[in-house]
Amino acid sequence: MRKSISHTFAILAAVLGLGQALGQAQNEIDVDIFNTGEVKAIPVHIEGFTGEILSLLKFDLSVQGFEFVDRGKAQFTIKGSNTGGSVSGAVYDHLKRGFVLNKRYQGGNLRLQGHTFANNVVETITGSPGIGLTKIAFRQFHGRNTEIHVADFDGFNAQRLTSDNSISAGPDWAPNGDTLFYYSYLKHNPDIYSHNIRTGQRRTVARFSGSNISPAVSPDGKRVAMVLSKAGSPDIWVASVNGTGFRRLTTTKAAESSPCWSPDGRFICFVSRAGGRSALYKIPANGGAMSRISTVHVSNATEPDWSPDGKAIAFTTQRGGRFDICIVPSSGGSA
């Protein structure tokens, strides 16, 4: 049975949608959340907050697996205020009948304080770090061209990173959070670059004849997988992040695309048409035989992304003229 999207991958859906943004203001973009109820959400009640901070908290928490209910149905009550230039917040556990978090935030702007409180709420209740202070990268159209932009994960504070006046696309973060890898037609050919967003320094990673696209940085930040066509058909290659030590992993006559790494860095998942249709495959990152990842009930799988715990792979598929996001166990199975 197809699963459109769960809370675990909600942010993935948001990022995929950003590439279609047209004509948005430089400091804010639209991010949509889709909830199909595949994962049981944590029921919480929120009170005391107003305006922008209330909207921020609801966005941050709904993306991370919370739903908002009446106080009588809530497992936790999140209460606080955002007056006087600061945010204060607390979490009451109805099962333990006591407060499990109570903090006041100062310094920075209100949005920063709000995201920080949301992170504290997530970690207090789930034990996992929140993602409220993370960034997203995306491409945005400027006339006929596309440029790379960076924004807060909720779409605010968007800033333009490239001004190549060409096609720039496929951004992928390095684990340090300071560097983006992407490809650009800056030199009239799709070449791969690394770009330090703090210093502005940009370096060429792959510039061969033909396509150099789809960079994906390894979890340890030392290697980058990519699609190169310098040997003929588009294949999966791996190199160091400084653009040395290139190694070809796939040698099929079919086109490969969209590499992504397993969280432990041992495997690379990608799309290949080796079987006639776009399907998911994986291959050892140090070289070896490629094997297919079955996606039962879905015959056309594209754009995979491995879950942080390594248990599942999210991917897109097109049905009836629309794209859906599906999830499959990383070993293959029903999608």
Each model region followed by its residue ranges:
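A structural "domain/chain start" motif
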Residues: L22-F59
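Amphipathic beta-strand/beta-sheet edge segments enriched in Tyr/Trp
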Residues: K58, K73-N120
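Structural motif
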Residues: S86-S88, R144-H149, N189-Y193, S233-W237, ...
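Residue-level detector of Asp-centered blade-edge/turn motifs that repeat once per structural unit
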Residues: G130-G132, P175-N176, P219-D220, P263-D264, ...
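Hydrophobic beta-strand positions that form the internal "hydrophobic ladder"
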Residues: I136, L180-F181, G221-A225, G265-I268, ...
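Short loop/turn segments immediately following the C-termini of beta-strands
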Residues: F141, Y185, S229, R273, ...
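Multi-bladed beta-propeller domains
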Residues: D152-I167, H195-I213, A239-S257, I283-T302, ...
